[in-house]
Structure formats: C-alpha cells, structure tokens
Amino acid sequence: MKVGIISLGCAKNQVDTEVMQGILENSNYKMTDDYYDADIIIVNTCGFIDDAKEESVDHILEVAQLKETGKLKVLIVAGCLSQRYQESLKEEIPEIDAMIGTDTQDKITEVISSALKGNYISFYDRLNKIDEQLFLRQPYQPGPSAYIKIAEGCHNYCSYCAIPLIRGGYRSRTIEDIKIEANHFIEKGSKELTLIAQDTTNYGSDIYGKFSLDTLLDELATIPGDFWIRVLYAYPTRITDSLIEVINRHEKICSYLDIPLQHIDDDILTSMNRGGNKEQILNLIHNLRKNIPDITLRTSLIVGFPGETDEKYQNLISFMQEIEFDHAGIFKYSDEEDTQAYNFKDKVSEDVKEQRYQEAWEVQKEITRKKNEGLVGTEMRVLIEEALEDEPTTKVGRTEGHAPEVDGAVIIPDCEASSGDFINVEIVQALDYDLIGEMTNEFS
C-alpha cells in the first residue's frame, strides 16, 4: 500500500507529520509523493486562522477528487482542523474516510486498517506523553535541519487564539527524552536543531516547577558535533536573564531569538491578554542586544485587532521603525470562534486591515533590506541546504540569523559544497530578504 502525506501549517504540524510517516514506514507502508499513485492520502491540516483553514479545506477537496481520477481508496484528515471541527467536517465532506486529532498520531495504522475495510473511524484522545512516537520520526522534507518539539499545547489563552482549545494545555517533554531525540538526529547527520513549542520559554514549568529552557539548552549544547541549536516561539515575559546568559555562552546556540510580540500598544496588549507592556518589551530588547551584541531578532505582529485605532496602529509602525527587527511576520487579525476576541466590539474593517497589513509589510521590507545591505562585504558562516533545481552549481543556505522556512536565505553561485556543509561566505549583494554570497573557504 502506498501512502502520501500532505503537511500544512506550522513546524509543529510538520513534526506530527514526521511521526506518522515514521510509524507507517516502520509498519511496511510505502511512502509516495505521487498522489495520483497513492492508495491512501493523509492531509495533516492547520486550523489556526481563516486563510489556513481555507487552504486545508481546499487540499481535502482536491484529494477527494482523486477517488475518481486516481487510485485513491482512503482519505484521512489529521491535525488541527479535524481536532477542532470533529463532527461538521465529516458532514460537509463525506468523502473523508477517517479523522484523527492532534495527539493521536500513534493510531494511524489502526485508522488505515479500519478505513480500508469501509469503516469510518476517528480518534481525538488527549495524550500526556508523546515521546515514544517522536522517536520513530522520519523527515518529511530533505535537508540538514530538524525540528525538535519540546512541548505540546498551551495555557496562555491569548484572547484571539484557539490553540489551547485545539491542542490542549501545556505538556513538556523531559530533558532526557529530548536529548535522546536530539542525539538521534545529530547521529543521522542533522546540522541544526530548531526547538519549537507553542511557547518554548514556558518549557519545564509543568514538570520541573520552573522555567527550564536554559537548563535544556545547557544539556543539548553538550552533545558532540558541529551543529546549531535555534530557539523559536519565545514568550517575551518569560525570557529570563539565565536564558540570555546561556544563549550567549554556548557557541552552538544561535545568537537568534524569535519573540512573537503581536503588538506594542498597551491597550491592545491588554485586550489580547498577552501580559507585559511596552516598557517591559523595550527593556527586554535592550537587555538582549546589550548582552548578546550580535543577536538576530524575529517577531510576529498582528494588525487590525479589534479596537486598533489609527493611533494605536501608528504606535505599532513607529515601534517597528524604532526597534528594526531583523525579520518579522505580519498577520491580519482573524476572527476565531470560541475565543474571547470573537465577541469583541470595534472590529476593524477588512479593507482597513488589508491596508495596514500591506503598509506594515513594506515597512518591514525596507528594514530587512537595510539590514541586509549592512552585511555586504562581511564574511559569514553558512549552512548549505540545497542546490537550485535548474542551476545545480548554485547552492542555497542560511546563516545563524536565518531560521528555516520563515526568514531569508543566502544564494551562492558556483559552489561545490553539499547539503549539510558549513562554509564561509562573503556577502556581495543584498536583496529585499535574501543575500548573494561567494564561498571563501574549503567546506566542512
């Protein structure tokens, strides 16, 4: 039996996809990227915002058509959308043969067996321990970087976010189990471990009684080998002095931090139930740049939140221009059922949201371009990821200031290095988001 998996959404969802792929390969299923040739297709969905939900539904409908045009026998929907819309999704798309939620990847073979017999089945149990599944992971995409999910769920309950409803409360993995998985990836040749969770800085609070990301990083940095460790999804009020010290002390830990702030106006932050205020955020950024002078900072920002007046929006733009984040993701507020913000008044019109979204992107593009221009003439260490398909001698890589998938890249023509090699590159040209470089040394 041939199985295809379509993975949508965030890196955390990709890890879930890799768990299912590993379980299936271990059970002698053959994986395929040719969906017309697949007997079974799993769509691992995202249900975070409207655009993501629409993309997930579109993929499900496209796959459903393969029951007529391909050899498809079974369509399985997994992930956030199936967890959130357990009953209505099957009613609206009857071609779905089975559904599993965000915590039941270990049931995938049982689900397939039942669906092949013509029996509809679904699993939505909430697990407290998922480590055994994670050890079976198989990479969904080729490359030298691996995501390490250090926790599942969230208990921040931001007013606009449905993730706690979808993925449950915060559950940390143990340091021992994470270190075993990290060792596994390094032994298989990974050159970058990217730590992810809904909130990485809350790591350990549930099982160790205190924020323990600093301790985890200390342990991971002792693993032998030449590789990077990167931290994404840090909550601003939980970035401790100890965490900053650990990031600065270890050469393996990238001088990089992703801190989703969402906004800077104090009234909006309060409405978002974010915790913290503008003054605390400014002090944090000052502290980070003072103690890690070469740090790269990324953030995520939401425009068009209910109650965002022109003045409050301009506060956000002024903040972006003052702080000059190296990278930023800009998102339009999306009404999500069953969240506090869904019932808020003073909604911002779609036209105004779109206008603010476009303007904020332009502001950030100019900032990133200026930052990139400042790198021209410098020499940087680059991790090679892949070759361009139509130009195999042109390689694409990233510096420690570029997280996988979400930030820019370094393009290196006439380069003999291979995926997974670290090389030194002189930056010769700056683009809006990417850099052009020339290799200056033998690769390793």
Curated annotation (Swiss-Prot):
Pfam families: Radical_SAM (PF04055), TRAM_2 (PF18693), UPF0004 (PF00919)
All residue ranges annotated as the Radical SAM core domain in the record: 140-370
Top-rank EC class of the record's enzyme: transferase
Keywords: 4Fe-4S, Cytoplasm, Iron, Iron-sulfur, Metal-binding, S-adenosyl-L-methionine, Transferase
Main location: cytoplasm
Highest taxon of source: Bacteria
Cofactor: [4Fe-4S] cluster
Record localization: Cytoplasm
Molecular function via GO: 4 iron, 4 sulfur cluster binding; aspartic acid methylthiotransferase activity; metal ion binding; protein methylthiotransferase activity
Catalysed reactions, semicolon-separated: L-aspartate(89)-[ribosomal protein uS12]-hydrogen + (sulfur carrier)-SH + AH2 + 2 S-adenosyl-L-methionine = 3-methylsulfanyl-L-aspartate(89)-[ribosomal protein uS12]-hydrogen + (sulfur carrier)-H + 5'-deoxyadenosine + L-methionine + A + S-adenosyl-L-homocysteine + 2 H(+)
Residues the record lists as binding [4Fe-4S] cluster 2: C154, C158, C161
EC number: 2.8.4.4
InterPro entries according to UniProt: Elp3/MiaA/NifB-like_rSAM, Methylthiotransferase, Methylthiotransferase_CS, Methylthiotransferase_N, Methylthiotransferase_N_sf, NA-bd_OB-fold, Ribosomal_uS12_MeSTrfase_RimO, rSAM
Residue positions binding [4Fe-4S] cluster 1: C10, C46, C80
Entries under NCBIfam families matching the protein: 30S ribosomal protein S12 methylthiotransferase RimO (TIGR01125), MiaB/RimO family radical SAM methylthiotransferase (TIGR00089)
PANTHER family referenced in this protein's UniProt entry, alphabetically: RIBOSOMAL PROTEIN S12 METHYLTHIOTRANSFERASE RIMO, RIBOSOMAL PROTEIN US12 METHYLTHIOTRANSFERASE RIMO
Entry's family note: Belongs to the methylthiotransferase family. RimO subfamily.
UniProt name for this protein: Ribosomal protein uS12 methylthiotransferase RimO
Annotated source species: Natranaerobius thermophilus (strain ATCC BAA-1301 / DSM 18059 / JW/NM-WN-LF)
Gene coding for it: rimO
